[in-house]
Amino acid sequence: MARITTEDCTGKISNHFDLTLVAARRARQLENGNTPLVDDARNNKPTVTALREIAAGHIGTELLTRNK
């Protein structure tokens, strides 16, 4: 699978600071056992899976306003 970069995600979340916060929070959720929203996530680290979810449009800035 191709590498994912933050540039792949800026179409969904244009603010780099928000992108970092969303990716970190989602990676923490994945690390704590939440189910990944993309296929083939088991071979990736939680941070990579979080970025893939953002790039696919499954996760956005609404994660920052929801309760943990």
UniProtKB/Swiss-Prot annotation:
Its EC number is 2.7.7.6. GO terms for molecular function: DNA binding; DNA-directed RNA polymerase activity. InterPro entries: DNA-dir_RNA_pol_omega, Pol_omega/Rpo6/RPB6, RPB6/omega-like_sf. Keywords: DNA-directed RNA polymerase, Nucleotidyltransferase, Transcription, Transferase. GO terms for biological process: DNA-templated transcription. One of its GO terms (cellular component) is DNA-directed RNA polymerase complex. Coiled coil: none annotated. Gene3D superfamilies: 3.90.940.10. The keyword Transcription applies. It catalyses: RNA(n) + a ribonucleoside 5'-triphosphate = RNA(n+1) + diphosphate. It comes from the Bacteria. The RNAP catalytic core consists of 2 alpha, 1 beta, 1 beta' and 1 omega subunit. When a sigma factor is associated with the core the holoenzyme is formed, which can initiate transcription. Promotes RNA polymerase assembly. Latches the N- and C-terminal regions of the beta' subunit thereby facilitating its interaction with the beta and alpha subunits. Belongs to the RNA polymerase subunit omega family. PANTHER family: DNA-DIRECTED RNA POLYMERASE SUBUNIT OMEGA. This is DNA-directed RNA polymerase subunit omega.
